[in-house]
Amino acid sequence: MLKIIIPTLMLIPLTWLSKNSMIWINTTAYSLLISFISLPLLSQFNENSLNMSLTFFSDPLSAPLLVLTTWLLPLMIMASQHHLSKEPLARKKLYITMLITLQTFLIMTFTATELIFFYILFEATLIPTLIIITRWGNQTERLNAGFYFLFYTLTGSLPLLIALTHIQNLTGSLNLLLIQYSTQTLPSSWSNAFLWLACMMAFMVKMPLYGLHLWLPKAHVEAPIAGSMVLAAILLKLGGYGMLRITMILNPLTSYMAYPFLMLSLWGMIMTSSICLRQTDLKSLIAYSSVSHMALVIVAVLIQTPWSYMGATALMIAHGLTSSVLFCLANSNYERTHSRTMILARGLQTLLPLMAMWWLLASLTNLALPPTINLVGELFVVMSSFSWSNITIILMGTNIIITALYSLYMLITTQRGKYTHHINNIKPSFTRENTLMALHLLPLLLLSLNPKIILGTLY
């Protein structure tokens, strides 16, 4: 793990010591190099102990998320170039430093062995994100969004710390590698029910569960492009990863404690998809679509079958890349038209034909068209939920139809129609932007050739 963590940390001196013209080139090139170094982790399995130590380890569940984290840093740096072009040099460097520290915290979170260590890093990721949102956001509402983000997440995760210390007293260890073998089955009592709630609530706020999701659209809409990308692609996955990790301690409580949350998620995914159909704000639409996709992951984790676990991990990776590319596209529109309102930026297909192709591909990926990896994840989740209860097929089917509807609605409102006259002199798309979209969409298409590397521990 150190072979990824130390190079990532060394990007910080690289940023501050690079000369003005070389900042973007250097950081992008070296962070891409780091993401290629992390790729061999995908093919190392549990029997291979080369990547285990007392503090860090990786297994088939954390490796895909780790690779996604490292892959996203160069893409975030590429996406931020335009909106930082007018900033002074020190501020550019500070921004990149924030992204790199966030990246380091995330890598350590995904590979932490100890649950308390995991918790500390889980909280530490809040600080760089908060600074990115409240310092470089576009409107003044960003402070409000930062408050929402911080207080929702902190309130959710305080009980987790208490629960973890209680589990430490109970079992004598919080080491993830040991705790798999030392867990006692928790008897059903009131205190254990609260223990379950305390453990799961932090991750459900982070996911976010429908009803606790109000911080997400706010944070997304106000964040700068890199903030939106990392929030959608990785910070939401922390919730799913934590749930997958902590449910193995909480057996057999989950089997009957999960019902209200399953209902909330199944209802919430339809509600948030329907909210998407009524959105005027492009970034807000993508944020709500994130909530509905993550609701599927919550359902999959709480059903607790091998198939649903595989579906959850596949869907997390797929959604990370998809929502990220949608935010990049929305940002490229925003940089040209200076408005996130969809009605004010219609008919862009005639002005940016190549961008229209990326829009089409991203929308089709979002509605889980084969051969993308989204389809693999959704199929696993739908089939496992159907075998858990037949009625869910109605809800899942409705959700899939509404997802297709709002994805196409987003595509048609931005690309088709007669373009408004105030945007007839916009710049064509840059090579940088096309590269950015290609680097998002290529993994999505290529992973479907070999999906087993992202199907998690149980494959």
Curated annotation (Swiss-Prot):
Protein name, UniProt field: NADH-ubiquinone oxidoreductase chain 4
Pfam families: Oxidored_q5_N, Proton_antipo_M
Documented EC number(s): 7.1.1.2
Transmembrane regions listed in the UniProt entry: 22-42, 60-80, 95-112, 113-133, 145-165, 194-214, 224-244, 257-277, 284-303, 308-330, 351-371, 391-411, 436-456
Assembly: Core subunit of respiratory chain NADH dehydrogenase (Complex I) which is composed of 45 different subunits.
Task of the protein: Core subunit of the mitochondrial membrane respiratory chain NADH dehydrogenase (Complex I) which catalyzes electron transfer from NADH through the respiratory chain, using ubiquinone as an electron acceptor. Essential for the catalytic activity and assembly of complex I.
Keyword set, alphabetical order: Electron transport, Membrane, Mitochondrion, Mitochondrion inner membrane, NAD, Respiratory chain, Translocase, Transmembrane, Transmembrane helix, Transport, Ubiquinone
Family per record: Belongs to the complex I subunit 4 family.
Entry membrane topology: Multi-pass membrane protein
Alphabetized GO MF terms: NADH dehydrogenase (ubiquinone) activity; ubiquinone binding
Membrane in keyword set: yes
Cellular compartment(s): Mitochondrion inner membrane
PANTHER family: NADH-UBIQUINONE OXIDOREDUCTASE CHAIN 4
Domain of life: Eukaryota
Catalysed reaction equations from the record: a ubiquinone + NADH + 5 H(+)(in) = a ubiquinol + NAD(+) + 4 H(+)(out)
Coiled coil regions in record: none
BP terms from Gene Ontology: electron transport coupled proton transport; mitochondrial electron transport, NADH to ubiquinone; mitochondrial respiratory chain complex I assembly
Main location: mitochondrion
Signal peptide: none
Gene: MT-ND4
Entry GO CC: mitochondrial inner membrane
